[in-house]
Amino acid sequence: MSQDYKTTLNLPATEFPMRGDLPKREPGILARWEAQGLYQQLRDNAAGRPLFVLHDGPPYANGRIHLGHAVNKILKDIIVKSRYLAGFDAPYVPGWDCHGLPIEIAVEKKWGKVGTKLDAVEFRQKCREFAEEQINIQRVDFKRLGVTGDWDNPYKTLSFDFEANEIRALSKVVANGHLVRGAKPVYWCFDCGSALAEAEIEYQEKESPAIDVAYAARDAQAIGQAFGVSVPADVEVAVPIWTTTPWTLPASLAVSLGAEITYVLAEGPAHNGKRRWLVLAAALAERALQRYGVENLVLHGETTGAALENQLLAHPFYPEREILVLNGDHVSDEDGTGAVHTAPGHGQEDFVVSQKYGLLDKYNAGQVTPIDGRGVYLESTPPAGDVVLAGQHLWKAQEAIVGVLRDNGSLLAFHPIRHSYPHCWRHKTPVVFRATPQWFISMDKANLRNDALAAIDTVGWFPTWGKARIQSMVDGRPDWTISRQRTWGVPIALFTHRQTGEIHPRSVELMQQVADRVEAEGIDVWYSLDATELLGAEAADYEKVTDILDVWFDSGVTHEGVLAARGFGKPADLYLEGSDQHRGWFQSSLLTGVAIDKRAPYKQCLTHGFTVDEHGRKMSKSLGNGIEPQDIMNKLGADILRLWIASADYSNEMSLSQEILKRNADAYRRLRNTARFLLGNLDGFDPAQHLRPLDQMVALDRWIVHRAWELQEKIKAAYDGYNMAEIVQLLLNFCSVDLGSLYLDVTKDRLYTMPTDSHGRRSAQSAMYHIAEAFTRWVAPILTFTADELWGYLPGEHAGHVLFTTWYDGLAPLPADAQLNATDFDQLLAVREQVAKVLEPMRANGAIGAALEAEITIAANEEQAAKWQPLADELRFLFISGDVQVRPATTDEVFVSAQPTTKAKCVRCWHHRADVGRNADHPELCGRCVSNVTGAGEVRSWF
């Protein structure tokens, strides 16, 4: 009867669960972290190390987190945790953006506008309470992602200390000469009832009426002279303009031409029984005339825009208004007519050129900007022909204005077009340019633009194209409108002179005093402040500014309110946000940083793409393709979500679908199963007693430690370069190829069959221990919950958390003078592949059932054969085959042949050996198994 030798084998055993069961297990781990105060422990453990500060860009405190939030926070968490392992102290202070319109709107829905049920003080308090509620909701979601940070002490832009530091930051901007006031055209949202900054604008397709309008010459002969021709008495002369905003025509005060553009005097369509000659850019004349129904191009003269400067035209429906011809750099001959109607109250370029010609001094405010903050024409707006404009909304009035132009013969062409148009990012409604008194950070007054462009060169940009993107934005951007006409925000704490409008000469000092009061009592103190408390007898001459600061200024000065205020220093090592933040937080932080310190507030900027479905479509409720992070965590676990984020190419759009999640769950299982196999084979291993020195290891074990060292160097470099996708690929490849298909497969024989405390087995366990120690660290930034779980199962004494350590130092490269060095292993593994190819057809035709049933012959040149012959008896373990013979050959190529074995099979190790049955007490065992069961055990040197 056969004996049962199962009890003589060292089979794997571990309590580390095979199933991750992450949705159930992760909350318990999270609760333990909270109870032990993990974040503070991390900081305490890292005290004295060099700082690495990833500064958190504040999400808006409104609503549950979405997938984009999860991507952002998890990428940050991966980087921060990798910095702890790299030997840094890496504080992470999460923050929230708490002021602004969305919160005002939410409060208005419940309580009405200011003055309805609540006064301004009560309204601000409700806004504060609402924001705090939203923060508490989002904080739970963020923590569930496994993000470790100072959640008990985050920064909030609504906190009194932050609001005070924001006013102090503004005082530095003032001190450095960057703040200006003026009635410039700014983006204006009728729904917000406020000015908008560049960062609050998004472009969407919109249909607009495109019209060509004739501005008749006041003196046709004067224009003819500019062209060097005499104009017949029965000919009218006009300058056509092309616009997509007919509503701005009541504000039209001039027509701009390009000084260096060539213009022609062309025969146009007749008007009121008279011929009409039109002034058109030469490059556009033919196309324009086709729009007007004129088939033949007939030219009467040619000149430049400079020659037409200061000519006078008639407004198309305000006959008493003289329209001056200007020269402007903004005019081109790429589209339209080459002439631009100029409404300084509704266009930035129009404003600049009108200011240059002194037009703003000739007209009152109602003529320059005839619409109010709701988009309604002022009562002072004259009618257009018979059409009353006063009290009408501009969008509704457009059709009537076009009708007036058609009736009086000024309309040369009309057709609707679809084009990209600025919209409010909150309301998704079209915005306009509207000149109102605002506060600006000037881009050029104190050289801010040039200084900011220079600062961009000092920053590392990931991906590299981010640099060119933000450069072009800063280079072309207008002054930054930082004032808002709203209630919930940090006040622009300035006193302006009632007569001159100038700010108080001691403004910087006064702002510091206001900030001290705000720090103690909050922003309401500004509104209740009696000016005499600070200004004394001067108070009667000054008034308080009632505008509040743009929320982009709030978040833009977090380098002052957080980095400087909390002692982290400036600049931060890294800012990391979505790719839309080149025009948002990256830029507002850059401008305030340069305005205050003359340097960028960050050393590096990293951007990630947006999430899309597997077809590249933006995720939305209407398409039904949205995936919520909460659903992923409840079904699969946060570590699966984290693995997807790490494995995706975040520099582009990040695709997610249920199939992609399934693939990541499969990848997670591969990683977990590898870790479990390592732990299972470390059963009974105590590194304090059993760890073998590297130079005493079996050669294969020493080689796998070398491979792990090589891998760790690549992983460290990838973490340093924020290349998480490469790390995931390296890990999966190592688990599948180096371990799964090779090392773990080969060493099973040694681990299972050799005596428990034999050198060969302890050597393999030592290698696995080194790999398990390193592996847990490698995955810790990404699989934060699983690494914590793994850490608790590693043999030996350990620190309280994997992140209390640094990268594993038990790995080392294989010396070049080792008996089998890395090159030797490359050659042997190439032979192993040849063996597998030779055995494949033998398996297919039934000659063998398994590789152990084949005997291998290797023919190699004499030098190679001489090197491999001493290994021959152990090569069968590397190849997982029957006996191996090495023979010298006259060729430089290596040849492998195989034949089925005729030797008996050992029931314990399954190898076919000639000595099976020689021991009478164990007739079914081979000689080495007899030795391993009853004697001193076999000796392994190589594999």
UniProtKB/Swiss-Prot annotation:
Which amino acids does the record list as binding Zn(2+)? C906, C909, C926, C929
For this entry, list what GO says about its biological process. isoleucyl-tRNA aminoacylation
Subunit-level organization: Monomer.
User: What does the UniProt cofactor note say?
Assistant: Binds 1 zinc ion per subunit.
Give GO cellular component annotations, separated by semicolons: cytosol
Listed GO MF terms: aminoacyl-tRNA deacylase activity; ATP binding; isoleucine-tRNA ligase activity; tRNA binding; zinc ion binding
Predominant subcellular localization, coarse grouping: cytoplasm
* Motif stretch ('HIGH' region): 59-69
- Keyword field contains Cell division: no
State the protein's name. Answer: Isoleucine--tRNA ligase
Q: Which UniProt keywords apply?
A: Aminoacyl-tRNA synthetase, ATP-binding, Cytoplasm, Ligase, Metal-binding, Nucleotide-binding, Protein biosynthesis, Zinc
InterPro entries the UniProt entry points to: aa-tRNA-synth_I_CS, aa-tRNA-synth_Ia, Anticodon_Ile_BEm, Ile-tRNA-ligase, Ile-tRNA-ligase_type1, Ile-tRNA_ligase, M/V/L/I-tRNA-synth_anticd-bd, Rossmann-like_a/b/a_fold
Which organism's genome codes for this protein?
Stenotrophomonas maltophilia (strain K279a)
Family, similarity comment: Belongs to the class-I aminoacyl-tRNA synthetase family. IleS type 1 subfamily.
Provide the transmembrane region boundaries. Answer: none
Q: Which PROSITE patterns match?
A: AA_TRNA_LIGASE_I
